[in-house]
């Protein structure tokens, strides 16, 4: 900001373009720190020149892109942020399309940069920026922590985290999940019990909060987590949550991060407000993104899942899941039991519908919807998903394949998925040794 107000002239544009080309050429991550006044007005007529917009759009699925807003950023500089994979800003920063002077001349509105695009707008309301930090040092530290989950580029293998807490573990999740499906519970403690050191990197925690998107290292390997948070809107999915999850999954798929989906929701948000916001369009986008993913997909149903809410959380049969798990106490169906049964006059029939949903996990397992349903109340209850992770290797361009063994699978058989380096998936059924 000390040089021509931080505006982007032809020389600055050339530098930005050059850095983008270097990141592509050397196949390394690109980190941008924003504090600028946008494009320099008196150089608008300088003719056609290479730009960083196109380069950033191409890079976003090739190398990790991180954008840090460390001050006021407007116009051209601010518009580069949404092209990145991850965006963070400091508490005093702002990110706006146009600054206060232009807003005043165009609309008569007298506002400040912070009111236009401070953290409360850019993060909480708009969802443009993912995370907020205290200052520049914290922003750089967060960028390092984020990049630690990613390879240098989309062709490299994922980094492995070694440490005393990176081994296999037995975890009983049942005390963390209330048996009453109407009682909300926090979802993050569930993941903290599964991952190394209990360390989660929440991405965009304050926007679209019905869905949690986070990065972690279970068994020393990087994963992406997309989970329903029952403590927010009872786990009902709204448009902001869907958009957040879709972007997060797109980034995970680009860099071969296996993805864990955790469902526990009554479906997508209903009502006139949700319909006016295009909830079905948002939900369809998330379904399409998760369906197109080439990375290993692992699904867990904790308590309940209904309707389209199950489809957007990767619980679709024959949709490329590596492992699909559930607690035996779950309920599932096209609709929750009460609404589904409300249209039935016969009380015996209503009771039958409710009973069917309460036994849903056992019936679903028998039909191979789930690969395993853990047994409640015994020493065998620990969810073996965490033990599976050390064997999960993404089958992307730079990796040799994937092999996951599913102990105690349905029907007294052992299911072993062998996924070669190609996209072909070869399921092999093996009799369990007795």
How does the language model describe each region?
Residues 1-426:
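Ligand-binding clefts of soluble mixed alpha/beta catalytic domains
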Residues 429-433:
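Short, intrinsically disordered C-terminal tails of secreted or membrane-associated proteins
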């Amino acid at each position: 900001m000390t040089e021509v107000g931080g505006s982007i002239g032809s020389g600055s544009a050339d530098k930005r373009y050059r850095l983008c080309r270097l990141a592509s050429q050397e196949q390394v991550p690109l980190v941008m720190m924003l504090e600028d006044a946008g494009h320099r007005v008196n150089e608008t007529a300088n003719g056609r020149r290479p730009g960083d917009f196109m380069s950033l759009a191409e890079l976003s699925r090739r190398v990790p892109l991180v954008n840090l807003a460390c001050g006021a950023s407007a116009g051209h500089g601010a518009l580069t942020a949404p092209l990145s994979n991850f965006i963070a800003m400091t508490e005093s920063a702002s990110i706006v399309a146009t600054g206060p002077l232009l807003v005043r001349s165009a609309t008569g509105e007298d506002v400040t940069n912070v009111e236009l695009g401070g953290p409360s707008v850019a993060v909480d309301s708009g969802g443009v920026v993912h995370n907020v930090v205290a200052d520049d040092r914290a922003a750089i530290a967060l960028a390092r922590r984020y990049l630690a989950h990613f390879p240098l580029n989309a062709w490299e293998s994922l980094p492995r985290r070694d440490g005393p807490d990176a081994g296999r573990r037995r975890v009983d999740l049942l005390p963390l999940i209330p048996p009453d499906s109407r009682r909300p519970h926090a979802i993050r403690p569930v993941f903290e019990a599964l991952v190394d050191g209990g360390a989660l990197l929440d991405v965009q925690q304050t926007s679209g909060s019905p869905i949690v998107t986070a990065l972690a290292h279970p068994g020393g390997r990087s994963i992406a987590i997309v989970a329903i948070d029952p403590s927010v809107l009872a786990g009902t999915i709204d448009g902001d949550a869907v958009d957040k999850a879709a972007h997060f999954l797109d980034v995970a798929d680009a860099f071969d991060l296996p993805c864990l989906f955790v469902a526990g929701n009554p479906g997508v948000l209903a009502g006139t407000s949700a319909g006016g916001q295009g909830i079905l369009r948002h939900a369809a986008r998330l379904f399409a993104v998760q369906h197109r993913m080439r990375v290993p997909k692992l699904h867990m149903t904790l308590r309940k899942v209904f309707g389209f809410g199950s489809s957007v959380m990767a619980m679709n049969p024959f949709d490329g899941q590596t492992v699909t798990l559930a607690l035996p106490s779950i309920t599932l169906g096209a609709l929750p039991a009460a609404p589904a049964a409300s249209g039935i006059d016969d009380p015996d029939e209503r009771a039958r519908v409710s009973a069917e949903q309460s036994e849903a996990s056992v019936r679903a397992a028998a039909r191979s919807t789930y690969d395993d349903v853990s047994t409640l109340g015994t020493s065998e209850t620990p969810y073996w998903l965490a033990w599976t992770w050390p064997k999960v290797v993404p089958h992307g361009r730079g990796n040799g394949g994937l092999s996951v063994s599913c102990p105690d699978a349905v029907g007294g058989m052992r299911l072993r998925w062998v996924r070669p380096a190609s996209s072909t998936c070869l399921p092999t059924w093996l009799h369990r040794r007795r």
